[in-house]
Amino acid sequence: MTTSKIGVRHAGHGHTVNIKYGYIIFGVSVLYALLLASAHFLELRQWRRQKRPSRSSVWARINNAPFWVHTLLWAAIVVGLAFTNVHDLSQNWTVVVKRLGRLAFCLVPLDLALALRPCLLGQSYLELMPLHKWLSRLIILAGVVHGIGFFVKWTIHHQLGKAKRWANLAGIIVALFSVLLVIVSSRPVRRRFYSYFYAFHNFTVALFVLLMIWHARPGVSDFVLLSVALLLFQGASRVYNGYSVPGLTIVDADAASLRLLRLQKPNSFPSVWQPGSHIRVGLPLSSWQSWVFPAHLYTLCSSPANDTLNLVVKKGRRFEMLTSLEYRVSCPYASLPTPWLSTAENVHIVCGGSGISLGIPLYEYFDNKSSVLANLHWCVSNARDTFVLSELGVNNPVNVYVTSGKIDQSSYDDADNEDAGLLGAGDNIELEPIPAENKSNPFTDDHAVNCAEQRIQMHAGRPNLSEILASFSETDDNAHKLLIVCGPVGLIRDVRAYGDAHGIAVFSELYNM
């Protein structure tokens, strides 16, 4: 009688050894999410108790660490786990290749959680969006290396026919769509075709999650179910936290580049929200387009006491709202960290173009507090845009700087058009000084009278930050000074540089004018 030795499937190739590393990185991601949520909560609690921000506390350092620090941390974790306990790499390199695929997919739940709206970690999801984007790229990179590694393995062993098997083909499909996603997510493509990028992004995510049911071996059904649950939560949240708009009024002015949209407030809309909050506006759920293309982010330029939800938008946007169509809005999302509303004593707000929609509600809130010194500075390329101040009933003093001339695109370049209401559609605000020969009053007499009645101080040319922010010197403690900037990237860069140079906290939001 002859005996034969039964070999173990994929003997020596770590077929099951990588399972635990998937659970390890998932456990690390859970701890990481808890750390982010805890750091955010504890920093704000400490801030409220001390009535001043503490930039040196460990919680503040974690909560305010640049996104690239988090990205490098996760890259180090993935690489470290990929090579842990792998001896004689020349013989066991396929273990690393297999492990990278599992590590990539087990990070998907964290990546989805970072993009949830509203965010479950306490922060504004806008704060976590850069981390979501770069973690997605890290996942794709690990997945692509995983795929290339298998092609190399099959080529060496003359087994390219394995690529035709459905389980492997599913992985190839995911890899191809992931590479395409990286291409369409590049800045030029994303800015120009954001709605299509958004649809392709969501399709690729769904494809990635579902095809892993067949591709991953051993299976990852638990991670698939968790990922599907997060996607369903996002869909349910969109339904539950949305409100149908009864009607829309468009307020326009001749020769102005901005317009005012007045949305009738839905009956069930929240009765309280923080000044400077955002809403998303899209088509009703009955429209298939609302499920395929993105809703658009706008800043609420109104208070809870108003009967309408007021939005200041740039004319000629890709997303044009019409009175003949129905719309749906989300619940308000806060932007400015809440403790600033009670601890700031000297506030300057610098806006560019439609960034005034964030500036007005915050300015009115701070200016109506007797203990706060508040100033609003607004840069516009068209003096006629100031009509929105009278339409919104702004009676507080406002400094308006009317600029002209083309600007250097490399200096004031548009940023990504990822939220077409808040982040604009590709036209810059002009911030260059008016040439000396043109510095006569650029306003008509009627316009000058209206501005005087509204306590608006009109200035020609780009503002000098050192001059307009000089009143910061009236407050000794920098911990109670706040500089808010909302506008294009160039304006934000200059204001941030001023804040850093003078030790003043800066809160910024990007608006492409």
Curated annotation (Swiss-Prot):
GO terms for cellular component: plasma membrane. Probable cell surface metalloreductase. May be involved in iron or copper homeostasis. Keywords: Electron transport, FAD, Flavoprotein, Ion transport, Membrane, NADP, Oxidoreductase, Transmembrane, Transmembrane helix, Transport. It is a multi-pass membrane protein. One of its GO terms (molecular function) is ferric-chelate reductase activity. InterPro entries: FAD-bd_8, Fe3_Rdtase_TM_dom, Fe_red_NAD-bd_6, FNR_nucleotide-bd, RBOH/FRE. Signal peptide: none annotated. Belongs to the ferric reductase (FRE) family. AIM14 subfamily. Disulfide bonds: none annotated. Pfam families: FAD_binding_8, Ferric_reduct, NAD_binding_6. This is Probable metalloreductase AIM14. One of its GO terms (biological process) is reductive iron assimilation. Its main location: membrane. It is found in: Membrane. The keyword ATP-binding does not apply. Residues 100-211 form the Ferric oxidoreductase domain. The chain crosses the membrane at residues 22-42, 66-86, 103-123, 138-158, 166-186, 193-213, 219-239. The keyword NADP applies. Its EC number is 1.16.1.-. It is an enzyme of class 1 (oxidoreductase). Residues 240-368 form the FAD-binding FR-type domain.
